[in-house]
UniProtKB/Swiss-Prot annotation:
Keywords from the UniProt entry: Lipoyl
Comment on bound cofactor: Binds 1 lipoyl cofactor covalently.
Ranges where the Lipoyl-binding domain occurs: 17-99
Native organism: Rhizobium leguminosarum bv. trifolii (strain WSM2304)
Cofactor: (R)-lipoate
Protein name: Glycine cleavage system H protein
Subunit comment: The glycine cleavage system is composed of four proteins: P, T, L and H.
Residue(s) carrying N6-lipoyllysine: K58
């Protein structure tokens, strides 16, 4: 199940685990990324907690945790090569995997149609 936030994160949810990244729209707004800082595996976050940071040639921006949960995995490839986020933000450029505290909370996030409307 693919969901989105108003802060331009995407979540691919499988069971109780969500893979999280930033959307094409966010990447377009930021420009070329030059730095990515990811959370520690095992860290817990509340919804909208500051989970990661990205820096581009234009600006620095926070990446928020879309739901309550625990980080189970991070993507070291984007730390080594932030351009992966630019080239494939909703694929190889994922940020972290989050074990959701309450998977039903995802129902309150945006679906693809609602997100497209938000960014139109």
């Amino acid at each position: 199940m693919l969901k989105f936030t108003e802060e331009h994160e995407w979540l691919q949810i499988e069971g109780s685990v969500a893979t999280v990244g930033i959307t094409n729209y966010a990447v377009d707004q930021l420009g070329d990324l030059v730095f990515v800082e990811l959370p520690e595996v095992g860290a817990t976050f509340s919804k909208n907690g500051n989970a990661a940071t990205v820096e581009s040639v234009k600006a620095a921006s926070d990446v928020y945790c879309p739901l309550d949960g625990e980080i189970t995995e991070v993507n070291p490839a984007i730390v080594a090569d932030p351009s992966l986020v630019n080239s494939d933000p909703q694929g190889a450029g994922w940020f972290f995997k989050l074990k959701l505290a309450n998977p039903a909370d995802a129902d309150g996030l945006l679906d693809e149609a609602a997100y497209k409307e938000l960014t139109a």
